[in-house]
Amino acid sequence: MARREIGIKKRGTSKRKLKPVYLIIAEGKNKTEVLYLSHFQDQEKNYSIRFVKAGHKTDADSLYNALVDKWEELDLSEKKGDRGFVILDIDNDPLKAQKVLALAQSNTNTAVSFVVSNPTFEVWFLLHFKYTTKQYKDGNAVIKELRRYLPNYEKNRDCFEDCKDETKEAVKNSIMLAEYYVDCEWPSIECNPRTDVGVLIACLEGEEEIRHY
């Protein structure tokens, strides 16, 4: 009988499945984004979503660095189809917008994309029900408008089922908004409202490649 080799398996050296890994990180104070995007973790998808814990610091630098650290820990590679997505709100804050823009421009990993919303992620939900170029003072103003269609909407509430039938409409509306602001720098507070979530969803559905800034 052939002798079987027995050895110690080192951490990080095991072969992972061939499915590409999509790393996603979002601001830690809200579970809204994670709750929504977790519905795209379909076993039949040709990728696997992994959420990265944001920790207490939710500024753009901290989110980006946390995702890059996890990327390196998992030994991910663009050549294998792995992707990273940093989901951010700029809250009509010019300093936040400038920080995200600078970070995106200095990012050397072309597999990592920034998914930005202004004022907040809720713009994406609102676009399921209407196309609008109306400007919003802040995230609360967006939520107030959203409650016309989802009266029970609250932060950290899973509203995927309430929106899923209009996802294609929301993608179309988000692309129309991007075209509306085509002459404006992005991210910037001039683009209000605007969100990249539609492009991310199209990417997750295999319909469109997400762009880079």
Tell what function each PLM region has:
Residues E27:
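Short, glycine-rich nucleotide/cofactor-binding loops
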Residues A2-Y22, K31-A54, V68-F85, I90-Y213:
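C-terminal accessory helical subdomains adjacent to catalytic cores in phosphodiester-
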Residues D59-L67:
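Eukaryotic endosomal/vacuolar membrane-trafficking regulators centered on PX-domain-mediated PI3P pathways
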